[in-house]
Amino acid sequence: MRKHYLKYLPVLFLLIFAASCKKDPKVAPTVTQPGNFAKLGLYEQVSGNNRRVFIAVSKIGTVSTTDYGLVFDTGSTGLSIDASGIIPASMITSSGFQITGDSVNVNGITITSQTATLTYGGVDGSIKEYGNLAYAQVTIGDGNGNVTTPRIPIFLYYKVVNVNTGTQLAAHSADVFGVGPGVSATARAIASPLSYFKLPDNITSGFRLAMLNSANFSATATYTAGLLYIGLTSDDLNASNFIMHPLTYSPIAGYLPNIKSTITYNGQNVPGTILFDTGTPATTIIENSAATSNSAALPANTVVSISTDQGFSYQYTTGTDFNLTQVENPSYSNDLRTIFSIDFFVSNEYLLDYTNHRIGLKNN
């Protein structure tokens, strides 16, 4: 999400040896390759031109939640969730949580006195969440399959506001499951909830996101099985044809998900960096310092292509409903990054290796 600075049990590695005697031929051992730590489904939904992919969170601390689908967001880092329905209403005020001392424990959640704000969105509209650093176990997924994290840092917010209008938004309307690398720039104790699992030695910390199913984007959130693989196998990293991109380190937010690329459209070759962002629901934003206007939409049937420094390439054609694309001048947006929307993930697979700080991209 564009942001201005915001079960399986592990499969054991088995060696199965065939018994033999003098008269029997020798049988080579069969090796069972390690599997991913967990494999979960996600929910796909569309409203107008806006596509969303959600991940279920069915428990925070000791509280079982209902219909808490969080935006699955490769463009931000950390889990942020509204406190409503999770802690007693008497603890929540319009100006903060009722906390005495450094922290309070309630419903299996430790809420600290450390406050922060998280901001999501771009120049055309953003939201700001007000809350505190908290710690809890989190059950990711639901009855279709789930896995529970160890006790991890999360952002528990008491208020969310539309920055442009000042309007306070409804509870749980801006819950985010940020899986990007590094840490949240404004709450730097918080990293991706997928990065905290204790994994077997032969599994690498990270995740793989399968290509989204365009047919499952409907007005009602539709469960799509097998989209998210938690924990990366050697095959994921070395034998799945992902093109790997090393990430750049920032002292503020840790490793950044931005990939050096050249973007081409209408005969222009624009060097820059790209954020591939499931949290951007509709419009790809190309940042071009040579743009003659602050912001302008590319017309339908415009061909846009990219080539990364590591050799990944992708091309699409703009439409009237999807693959919408806007060109902005960074002097207007105050953001140098080109942001590719969720539409990219309908045609491509995505992998994030937390351990080795790299992103893999793969055409399908």
Write out the residue ranges for each language-model feature.
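Bacterial Sec-dependent N-terminal signal peptides
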Residues: 1-33
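Pepsin/retropepsin-fold aspartyl endopeptidases
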Residues: 21-364
